Amino acid sequence: DVHSNTGIFGIHTS
């Protein structure tokens, strides 16, 4: 979901 890992990007990339 959004704001889970990146925060700045707002997308869970990892």
From Swiss-Prot:
Q: What other remark does the UniProt record contain for this protein?
A: On the 2D-gel the determined pI of this unknown protein is: 6.1, its MW is: 50.3 kDa.
This protein is called Unknown protein from spot 263 of 2D-PAGE of etiolated coleoptile
Organism, by scientific name, is: Zea mays
